[in-house]
């Protein structure tokens, strides 16, 4: 079956790398913020880099907030895109001094990682502990490494389908209904990341 794959055009910097990662798997992909295109998609990606406050501002200016909430097909938020699915974020610019209201599609609140002596941001390769049998991680080795770059994270909760440890446990992957999210960058995570993208496209 031919999949209608759409990356929601959030205006963020990593859209092209996500697009290339999907195309490498043999799928055609469209980048769009047109409601007709977005709502007709079989699978959607919500990429994000930068701060939550800037990203929510971009979504507001592009009339994307209500559109994302209307999506009924599987949507995968990547990195900041995952965090935006939560209720709120502490991330405003360089300082956690104001709460940013997010999309409220997942019952999680994004907070600054408490890492003790470990440096922030959490940057580099790390393993994740997956909820057994979740289809997003089909065929991925339990000790597979994924690439992370972040200082804020969603805590572990009922929505967590994989968690990671960096000073504290946090959600590495989440699901709430048709909304999925990964804190790591699958498009930069070699074979394991490519397999995860393929698994999502085959859901």
UniProtKB/Swiss-Prot annotation:
GO molecular function: glutaminase activity; imidazoleglycerol-phosphate synthase activity; lyase activity
Glutamine amidotransferase type-1 domain segment(s): 4-203
HAMAP family: HisH (MF_00278)
Domain of life: Bacteria
A GO biological-process term: L-histidine biosynthetic process
Recorded GO CC terms: cytoplasm
PANTHER family: IMIDAZOLE GLYCEROL PHOSPHATE SYNTHASE SUBUNIT HISH
Enzyme Commission number(s): 4.3.2.10, 3.5.1.2
Protein keywords: Amino-acid biosynthesis, Cytoplasm, Glutamine amidotransferase, Histidine biosynthesis, Hydrolase, Lyase
Pfam family, one: GATase
Function in brief: IGPS catalyzes the conversion of PRFAR and glutamine to IGP, AICAR and glutamate. The HisH subunit catalyzes the hydrolysis of glutamine to glutamate and ammonia as part of the synthesis of IGP and AICAR. The resulting ammonia molecule is channeled to the active site of HisF.
NCBIfam families: IMP_synth_hisH (TIGR01855)
Pathway(s) annotated for this protein in UniProt: Amino-acid biosynthesis; L-histidine biosynthesis; L-histidine from 5-phospho-alpha-D-ribose 1-diphosphate: step 5/9
SUPFAM superfamilies noted in UniProt: Class I glutamine amidotransferase-like
Name listed for the protein in its UniProt record: Imidazole glycerol phosphate synthase subunit HisH
Gene from which this protein is expressed: hisH
Active site location: 79 (nucleophile), 185, 187
Compartment list: Cytoplasm
Keyword DNA-binding: no
Gene3D superfamilies attached to this UniProt entry: 3.40.50.880
Catalyzed reactions: 5-[(5-phospho-1-deoxy-D-ribulos-1-ylimino)methylamino]-1-(5-phospho-beta-D-ribosyl)imidazole-4-carboxamide + L-glutamine = D-erythro-1-(imidazol-4-yl)glycerol 3-phosphate + 5-amino-1-(5-phospho-beta-D-ribosyl)imidazole-4-carboxamide + L-glutamate + H(+); L-glutamine + H2O = L-glutamate + NH4(+)
InterPro entries from the UniProt entry: Class_I_gatase-like, GATASE, Imidazole-glycPsynth_HisH
Annotated PROSITE patterns: GATASE_TYPE_1 (PS51273)
Organism: Vibrio cholerae serotype O1 (strain ATCC 39315 / El Tor Inaba N16961)
Oligomeric form and interacting partners: Heterodimer of HisH and HisF.
